[in-house]
């Protein structure tokens, strides 16, 4: 029996050394050391041995089992290393092959428009400032000379948190906050989100974007306002763009005007974009009302100023020929990729 055990060990070691995969090694383990394996079959004959022979044979059998198990572990480590090396070789990246192109995102047309507006007004010496979106009634209405019964104060137009706190309906409150903190000369623009209680449709949104401009200094005139807006229009819509003023009424400016620009699409000849009249409404503007200056501690006898406000969403739609404001807020890459 001792000879059988030694022969079994040599046979097992030879087979294990020739194994080329972990699967073959597992088969060898089961074949030699399993419950129905060759070692078990040999040990079943121990019943025929004398009492003196059994301990010796048992000791040899245990040693054979240990040697086979050690050979299996050693071979398993070697085979696993070779399998990993083979797998890595198969997965080797050819660095000479061109890489997969990564699709770059694009600026949203609103973001493009805001960047253009900032660049235009900064080039004219304006400073960009910001203000809170959650605003007080004073800064949104009272400080801007809006009458107590002005329709814009109604809950049908304005989102109220309480009787004194609202979501701002315009960027104009930044004018008051700036004039309270700064002494003339002042030359600022403010861009941001505004909110009105509108039902969404092709031209209205409860959330939209505005840019507000303010200049205050000694001797500021309507001519300065016109010159500033002409530079803006030519830079934003095109060098051939012209503007015209129409009398209007705003509580925070006097005199006030709505400003039209020649249609960027037809150059003033008349088309579907401008509804055939050659002009498109662009913004509201005027000279800062003396009451607004007084509210901010600025003497209107010494200083004057002009202000203007534009809907950035509308400007974007006009510039890029977008006919539905809702498209600006749907985050559809098929739409954004067009610009």
Curated annotation (Swiss-Prot):
Principal location class: cytoplasm
Family: Belongs to the class-II aminoacyl-tRNA synthetase family. Phe-tRNA synthetase alpha subunit type 1 subfamily.
Family matches, as Pfam families: Phe_tRNA-synt_N, tRNA-synt_2d
Species, as recorded: Alkaliphilus oremlandii (strain OhILAs) (Clostridium oremlandii (strain OhILAs))
GO biological process: phenylalanyl-tRNA aminoacylation
Molecular function GO terms recorded: ATP binding; catalytic activity, acting on a protein; magnesium ion binding; phenylalanine-tRNA ligase activity; transferase activity; tRNA binding
Cofactor: Mg(2+)
Name of this protein: Phenylalanine--tRNA ligase alpha subunit
Superkingdom as given in the UniProt entry: Bacteria
Lineage, highest ranks first: Bacteria, Bacillati, Bacillota, Clostridia, Peptostreptococcales
GO cellular-component term (any): cytoplasm
Protein biosynthesis found in the keyword field: yes
Annotated cofactor note: Binds 2 magnesium ions per tetramer.
Top EC class of this enzyme: ligase
Record gene name: pheS
Keywords tagged on the record: Aminoacyl-tRNA synthetase, ATP-binding, Cytoplasm, Ligase, Magnesium, Metal-binding, Nucleotide-binding, Protein biosynthesis
């Amino acid at each position: 029996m001792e000879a059988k055990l030694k022969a079994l060990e040599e046979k097992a070691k030879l087979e294990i050394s020739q194994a080329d995969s972990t699967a073959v090694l597992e088969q060898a383990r089961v074949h030699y050391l399993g419950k129905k394996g060759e070692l078990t079959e040999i040990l079943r004959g121990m019943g025929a041995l004398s009492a003196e022979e059994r301990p010796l044979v048992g000791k040899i059998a245990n040693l054979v089992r240990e040697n086979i198990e050690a050979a299996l572990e050693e071979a398993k480590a070697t085979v696993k290393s070779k399998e990993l090396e083979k797998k890595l070789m198969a997965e080797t990246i050819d660095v000479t092959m061109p890489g997969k192109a990564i699709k770059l995102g694009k600026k949203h047309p609103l973001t493009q428009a805001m960047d253009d507006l900032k660049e235009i007004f900064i080039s004219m010496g304006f400073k960009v400032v910001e203000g809170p979106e959650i605003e007080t009634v004073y800064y949104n209405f009272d400080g801007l000379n809006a009458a107590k019964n002005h329709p814009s104060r109604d809950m049908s137009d304005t989102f109220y948190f309480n009787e004194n706190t609202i979501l701002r309906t315009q960027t104009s409150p930044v004018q008051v906050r700036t004039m309270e903190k700064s002494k003339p000369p002042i030359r600022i623009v403010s861009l941001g989100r505004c909110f009105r209680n509108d039902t969404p449709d092709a031209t209205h949104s409860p959330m939209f974007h505005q840019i507000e401009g303010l200049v205050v200094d000694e001797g500021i005139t309507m001519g300065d306002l016109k010159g500033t807006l002409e530079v803006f229009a030519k830079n934003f819509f095109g060098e051939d763009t012209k503007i015209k003023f129409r009398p209007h009424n705003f509580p925070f400016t006097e005199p006030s005007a709505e400003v039209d620009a020649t249609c960027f699409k037809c150059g003033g000849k008349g088309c579907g974009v401008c509804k055939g009249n050659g002009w498109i409404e662009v913004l509201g503007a005027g000279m800062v009302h003396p009451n607004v200056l007084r509210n901010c501690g600025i003497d209107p006898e010494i200083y004057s100023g002009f202000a203007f406000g534009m809907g950035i969403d509308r400007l974007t739609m006009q510039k890029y020929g977008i006919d539905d404001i809702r498209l600006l807020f749907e985050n559809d890459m098929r739409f954004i990729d067009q610009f």
